[in-house]
């Protein structure tokens, strides 16, 4: 479990996150959503150990700020919102970086691991291409393949591992959005945990178990999809009169964006 309690972050003397509390369970996909600039990425960076914070963030009972970088790398992989690489690395070289930063449970099968990770994100045959030559969506999938090489198994020594994904489908077409979200969902089904910053509320409703809504750096709501995705909460958090409907087959909520045409 990842337990976030009283999380607060200040950057350049300004409060960005204030007193955020929630828990993410292994075996579940927890989505973090909210308006632009609400503090979602800052929250994720604090959870991953990239930013100093007040309060508590625990992974498997261990305080994140007390763990060394190599200890964090062994239990969580991070997909950043954007990645800029100055040197002309090939796709293969980028993906293999994940093998050097994680546990690399099978060092004798490094090439196979890299190939399998690329195949899982639909990039077979891209190994020799230069990263800078790829489209934004292709680069995003390369970075996810790197993360999958770092955290290759959802459970290691009886303890769950985590994928921390910041807007993992923001640059992807609908087909690859479904591919990546299904991959994340399957990681959870195998016992691992996923926290993903999401903007698409319908993908969130389709794939997430729980959702955390952040507004202006504070927790606005947290709970199951059915508990959080309500007309009243959408109006309160996003300022839009969004209508939440349900798919007849299984009752999964979905957001009817057309209902917000009156949104200022």
Curated annotation (Swiss-Prot):
The complex is composed of two ATP-binding proteins (HmuV), two transmembrane proteins (HmuU) and a solute-binding protein (HmuT). ATP binds at residues 34-41. It is a peripheral membrane protein. Keywords: ATP-binding, Cell inner membrane, Cell membrane, Membrane, Nucleotide-binding, Translocase, Transport. It holds the Pfam family ABC_tran. Disulfide bonds: none annotated. It is an enzyme of class 7 (translocase). The keyword Ribonucleoprotein does not apply. Residues 2-241 form the ABC transporter domain. This is Hemin import ATP-binding protein HmuV. The keyword Membrane applies. It is found in: Cell inner membrane. Part of the ABC transporter complex HmuTUV involved in hemin import. Responsible for energy coupling to the transport system. Belongs to the ABC transporter superfamily. Heme (hemin) importer (TC 3.A.1.14.5) family. Its EC number is 7.6.2.-. It comes from the Bacteria. The lineage of its organism: Bacteria, Pseudomonadati, Pseudomonadota, Alphaproteobacteria, Hyphomicrobiales. SMART domains: AAA. Its main location: membrane. One of its GO terms (cellular component) is plasma membrane. The gene is hmuV. GO terms for molecular function: ATP binding; ATP hydrolysis activity. It comes from Rhizobium etli (strain ATCC 51251 / DSM 11541 / JCM 21823 / NBRC 15573 / CFN 42).
């Amino acid at each position: 479990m990842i337990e976030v309690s009283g999380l607060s972050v200040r950057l350049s003397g300004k409060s960005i996150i204030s007193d955020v509390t929630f828990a993410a369970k292994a075996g579940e996909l927890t989505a973090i959503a909210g308006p632009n600039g609400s503090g979602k990425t800052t929250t994720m960076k604090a959870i991953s150990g990239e930013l100093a914070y007040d309060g508590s963030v625990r992974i498997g009972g261990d305080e994140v700020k007390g763990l060394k970088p190599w200890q964090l790398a062994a239990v969580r992989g991070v997909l950043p919102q954007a990645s800029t690489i100055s040197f002309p690395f090939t796709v293969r070289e980028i993906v293999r970086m994940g093998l050097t930063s994680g546990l690399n449970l099978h060092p004798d099968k490094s090439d196979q691991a890299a190939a399998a990770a690329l195949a899982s994100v639909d990039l077979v045959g891209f190994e020799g291409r230069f990263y800078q030559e790829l489209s934004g969506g292709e680069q995003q999938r390369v970075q996810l393949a790197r993360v999958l090489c770092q955290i290759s198994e959802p459970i290691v020594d009886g303890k769950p591992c985590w994928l921390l994904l910041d807007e993992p489908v923001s640059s992807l077409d609908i087909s690859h959005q479904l591919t990546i979200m299904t991959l994340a969902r399957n990681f959870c089904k195998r016992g691992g945990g996923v926290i993903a910053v999401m903007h698409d509320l319908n993908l969130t409703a389709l794939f997430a178990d729980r959702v955390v809504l952040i507004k202006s750096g504070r927790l606005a709501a947290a709970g199951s999809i059915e508990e959080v995705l309500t007309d009243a909460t959408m109006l309160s958090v996003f300022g839009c009169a969004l209508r939440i409907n349900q798919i007849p087959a299984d009752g999964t909520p979905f957001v009817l964006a057309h209902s917000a045409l009156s949104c200022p």
